[in-house]
């Protein structure tokens, strides 16, 4: 019986990527998305050669399209360093596309583990998921840093608009050979949006919310985050939280990391930009794998999102693939980028068939793994080292085929 394709009323923005993830991205589209959906895709290639050819304008255009259509689904991309500039003969060492997109969309990145019963956790006490919300604007990622050469005074100056009454702070008096300096910032508007997004996410999940800062050291900077979160909580969320039996609490980052390690999970953790970058990888590994993590950027308007894979472009596998060798690359996070993006499209469009499809595709991924069909990285978590043999895992395409079979079975079962 032929499957009647699901019509998706409104477009989605697709941001293609680099290396091995670009290879699996195409396979996911061809085997798990396009056979089942009638879909208008606004396509942007964020592969490094095309970013270079367009002077990185394509990255900005893709973010602007996301603002227009409200849903973007992004493949992993290369952030070039010196070696990549040489390898690709780039005009410039282009900025991280994720950083560019996040700064335009000014959102909060929420990451959450994909839990499979048969994948052991490095932190066995984590029996419930932990959703980490990373403020995706400003701080170190928008900072101006410099190398200081020689002796001299470093000053921080603020000149108010329409006034000559500048405020000047002496930061440090360099007396030796020099050193390094950094100036960074954030805005009240962005922190307020971060607070709203975090409060909303925790309320939707009916989980408590924790904000972590180091306000004992950065009394003004981190203190502002703490104050704004408290204001937003008191004004808009306190009564809702009390009714739902959940709570909001501020904690010092060091105390929060210790608490996270001994907790059972089941909460939303709001992190400043750098803390979120670091702690999301700590959580991913603790739950089992970076390849089992969802990542969604939620914008302040509440209706615009960008879903992505939380890992890199898997360069090592791509080198093997280029030589015609067999790879076993985990595509689950990339599949979940599609499902989370499409699920949001379904919610915006009130499209129940599409929402049901995304749930079945996610269940097909987890079902495949729990039935013993998985890629090498996951098999290695279960069967350590030399005990692992080729029969214990599937290659890149075999795994996507296994998910496709599982998905078709679930769709047919629902139809019957």
Curated annotation (Swiss-Prot):
Pfam families, per database record: Iso_dh (PF00180)
Chain residues that bind Mn(2+): 254, 277
Presence of keyword NADP: yes
Keywords assigned by UniProt, alphabetized: Cytoplasm, Glyoxylate bypass, Magnesium, Manganese, Metal-binding, NADP, Oxidoreductase, Tricarboxylic acid cycle
First-listed, main subcellular location of the protein, grouped into a coarse class: cytoplasm
InterPro entries: IsoCit/isopropylmalate_DH_CS, Isocitrate_DH_NADP, IsoPropMal-DH-like_dom
Binding site for NADP(+): 77-79, 84, 262, 312-317, 330
EC number(s) on file: 1.1.1.42
Positions marked as site (Critical for catalysis): 141, 214
Compartments, as annotated in UniProt: Cytoplasm
Signal peptide (from-to): none
Cofactor(s) required, per the database record: Mg(2+); Mn(2+)
Cofactor note: Binds 1 Mg(2+) or Mn(2+) ion per subunit.
Residues the record lists as binding substrate: 79, 96-102, 111, 134
GO cellular component annotations of the record: mitochondrion
UniProt subunit comment: Heterodimer.
Function description: May supply 2-oxoglutarate for amino acid biosynthesis and ammonia assimilation via the glutamine synthetase/glutamate synthase (GS/GOGAT) pathway.
Family from the record: Belongs to the isocitrate and isopropylmalate dehydrogenases family.
Protein name: Isocitrate dehydrogenase [NADP]
Taxon lineage: Eukaryota, Viridiplantae, Streptophyta, Embryophyta, Tracheophyta
Gene: ICDH-1
